[in-house]
């Protein structure tokens, strides 16, 4: 003997009326929505003067907050661009100036030992011009004016030493230009370190 709902056989004849009632209910709901949305209300719109000042204040605060957030984001973007520009230019200076100075020192050693400087002139000139071109090509408007000026001074000094080697300038003139190169390189690298 079965006890409970399973004991009673199921009837399948009542599904059609239930589905019909469901369909009629959906149609009635749809019609109520259409009729309710198309009804026009008569009258004149009046703002709630008690709430309007609070609304204006809320909108003003929202606009101010949005402007502040936008300003902060722009400052962060500019700082990121500046940091990238500093890193690019300072890395170019550090990477190329070492090779240039090494090649100039090889030229100076050959000169001081009374050897033929011909084999060391070309590499020194090329390294100096390469360093100047690389640093010059890395400069951008995102750099501070002071750092840009220091890097440009190095570029000019490197080219001046390359010209002195190529023109076989006097020892005094060559030394003056090398001193200027060393000073500008040191100043630019010091500013690079301070910028990080």
Swiss-Prot record:
The keyword Membrane applies. It is found in: Membrane. Keywords: Membrane, Transmembrane, Transmembrane helix. The chain crosses the membrane at residues 20-40. It is a single-pass membrane protein. GO terms for cellular component: extracellular region; membrane. This is Uncharacterized protein Rv2240c. Its main location: membrane.
């Amino acid at each position: 003997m079965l006890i409970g709902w399973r004991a009673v056989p199921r009837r399948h004849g009542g599904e059609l009326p239930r589905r019909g009632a469901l369909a009629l209910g959906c149609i009635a709901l749809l019609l109520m929505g259409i009729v309710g949305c198309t009804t026009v209300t008569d009258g004149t719109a009046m703002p709630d003067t008690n709430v309007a000042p609070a609304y204006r204040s809320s909108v003003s605060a929202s606009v101010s907050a949005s402007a502040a957030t936008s300003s902060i984001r722009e400052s962060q973007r500019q700082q990121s661009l500046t940091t990238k520009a500093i890193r690019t230019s300072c890395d170019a200076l550090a990477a190329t100036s070492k090779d240039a100075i090494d090649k100039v020192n090889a030229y100076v050693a050959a000169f001081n030992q009374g050897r033929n400087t011909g084999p060391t002139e070309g590499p020194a000139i090329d390294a100096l011009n390469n360093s100047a071109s690389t640093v010059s090509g890395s400069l951008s408007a995102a750099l501070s004016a002071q750092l840009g000026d220091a890097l440009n001074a190095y570029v000019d000094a490197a080219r001046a030493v390359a010209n002195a080697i190529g023109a076989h300038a006097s020892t005094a003139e060559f030394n003056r230009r090398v001193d200027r190169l060393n000073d500008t390189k040191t100043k630019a690298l010091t500013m690079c370190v301070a910028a990080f």
